[in-house]
């Protein structure tokens, strides 16, 4: 029971930190300047680690989305080339010969 509460708290904290990183990424609003004004070194260091962990999670997630979209686009374009080559066959041609349309 205690372990599930801790895991839930850590997951919620990661979501909040990642949301703050997303806000900074898309709007430019950053909490790093106000965080640097905190006088207590331990609290400031903890807050900076917390904010930087959200940045790390957001950047890794964004990188994964970009890589998967690039792979998806490249596989879709290859599929379109194959589909177009099959559609460009002349109706009277045999299955062994391919007639290409001129553009």
Swiss-Prot record:
This protein's UniProt keywords: Glycoprotein, Secreted, Signal
Any single Pfam family the record assigns to this protein: Mitofissin
Lineage top rank: taxon: Eukaryota
Annotated glycosylation sites: 67
GO cellular component terms, A-Z: cytoplasm; extracellular region
Annotated spans, Disordered: 73-103
Coiled coil: none
Transmembrane parts of this sequence: none
Cellular localisation: Secreted
Principal place of residence: secreted
Signal peptide: 1-13
The name this protein goes by in its record: Putative uncharacterized protein DDB_G0282937
Species of the source: Dictyostelium discoideum (Social amoeba)
């Amino acid at each position: 029971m205690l372990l599930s509460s801790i895991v839930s708290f850590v997951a919620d904290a990661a979501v909040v930190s990642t949301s703050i990183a997303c806000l900074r990424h898309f709007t430019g609003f950053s909490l790093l300047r106000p965080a640097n004004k905190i006088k207590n070194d331990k609290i400031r260091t903890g807050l900076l680690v917390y904010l930087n962990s959200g940045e790390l999670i957001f950047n890794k997630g964004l990188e994964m989305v970009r890589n998967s979209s690039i792979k998806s686009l490249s596989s879709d374009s290859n599929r379109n080339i194959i589909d177009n080559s099959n559609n460009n066959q002349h109706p009277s041609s045999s299955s062994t010969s391919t007639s290409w349309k001129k553009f």
